[in-house]
Every structure is written in C-alpha cells, then in structure tokens.
From Swiss-Prot:
GO terms for molecular function: ATP binding; homoserine kinase activity. Belongs to the GHMP kinase family. Homoserine kinase subfamily. It is an enzyme of class 2 (transferase). It comes from Lysinibacillus sphaericus (strain C3-41). HAMAP family: Homoser_kinase. This is Homoserine kinase.
Amino acid sequence: MNKTWQISVPGSTANLGPGFDSIGLGLSLYLQLTVTLQDTWAIIHLDDNGPKEFELEEHLLYVIAKKVAEQYGQQLPACRVEMASELPLARGLGSSAAVIVAGIELANQVCGLGLSVQDKLNLSSQIEGHPDNATASVLGGLTISSMDEKGNVDTFHINKIDASFVVYIPNVELKTSESRSVLPEQFDRAYAVHASANANMLAASLMARDFQRAGRYMEEDLFHEPFRAKLIPEYSEIRTAAKKNGAYGTALSGAGPTLISIIPSTIAGDFVQTMKKQFPEHQVIVTKADEQGIQVREYMKRLL
C-alpha cells in the first residue's frame, strides 16, 4: 500500500479586460493530479494538454515541486504523477499557473510542509510574477490582488459568482511572452488615469455583482487589449456577436488567444449553440466560476 494524493486545481482567466495582472477568476476547468510515492520518478500525461516530450528535470511540475521542497529544507521524494488537464497550453486559461499551484501543493503534501493558504498565494504569485491566475487557482472564485516588492500578496476574494462564462478557444497557441511584446513600455498620465478608472469600475462592479456594468467595463480596457487585438483570431467579430446574443461583455482571457464572455446563466444553452454555429473554428465552452480552489484528497493505494 502506497500513500496517494489526488490534487485538483482549477484553471483560471485573468484580467477580465482592464484588471491587468491583478484580477483573476477560477473556472470549472481543471488540472487533476494523482500522486503516488514510489522508488523512481514518473510523470504521465493522460491527454494532449501537456508536453509531448520532456526531460523530467525540465518539467514545470517537477521544477516547482523540487524548488519549493528545497526552499523549506526538504528533499523531494520520488513519485508517480498522472496528470489529466482540461486546460489547453498557451491559450490564456491559466495552464501554467495551475501547474505551478499543483507543484507547490505536491511538495506541500509529500514533504509535509504544512503550508498555509497565504504561503501558497505568495509562492505561486512570486513564481508566476503576478497574482491574477495564481490566486484564482489557489482560492477559486473571483480574486482582486496586489503583490508588494517583497512578494507578499493581498487578495480580496469572492467565492460565488452568479453568472456563467463562455470561452472561445482557437486552434492556435499564443505564448504570453509574445503577447507581452506588443505592449507599450509606458503610457502618458491622462491615458493611465483613464485606464485605471476603467479598472476601478470593473472591480467595483464585480464586487457589487452588477454584471451588466461589469460587462461594459470588461470591454473598456486600455492597458493591453487594444495592442493585443491584432494577434487574436476573430477578436472583434466574437465580441460583436456575443453582445448581440445577450452577453454582458467579452474580453481576452489572460494574454489570449482565448476570449471569454460573461453571460446570464439563464441563456447559457442557447447562447453557446448560437456561437458555435457562428464560429466553428473555435472550441466554444460554457463554464462556471469554481468556488473551492485547490482540493486535496489523501488515501492509500495498492500497487500491482
């Protein structure tokens, strides 16, 4: 009998328009790990949403777990890790943040680190470089966060969001580094004030659960979407069609290329069917806000 852990981490969307690098939302699309202690390391991907070929020492999950264990003075024991993911790579659905959060939790469990939720928020955000996706994967729900120069994260968290979300996933990858390369190095003061005001209105509307207004401000970003739009397949067409069919608003999911709409849950079925017909080159999926964040179950497993 070997000790085994099942670790579930929600994917996420970041920004929701003008909430650049600070607003995140956990989604009901998951990275699932089954981790079993054994004599040698093995990482097995059970689907296509993972690297097809890799060296163990370069796999992000292993790199993060080993780094965290060593940071706390522990040696990471060998494990068999089976990974199943609903998060396509480089599509703007928090796949890398989910693996980072999973790696931290793997080290926490197999090394008995006893990490607090705050520890996980800090570690994951420091590794990611910003707290939007990381906090959403740790906590679930809506997160509005700030990280100081020492890497300490402060998060406002709402776990229940009474709306549905539709993602439009194109069959192309877009690396975050490429998407960041088109952004300006600086803005003038008046532009920055306007952009910040829109971000403030988005955050306030989400906190007030005023999704009509939140949807409006999702489409009023000035920090990144005007510059990234040219990289995104059917960016304007999807936004226009979504609004026509009843969406509150549509924005890039993270750095793209996926787009995400917030919609009333009552129209979800008809909305998705209509958008699928209009955009057959995209995978159109309705999802909800995850309300729990990272989940862990421990049990004993008999190895054959």
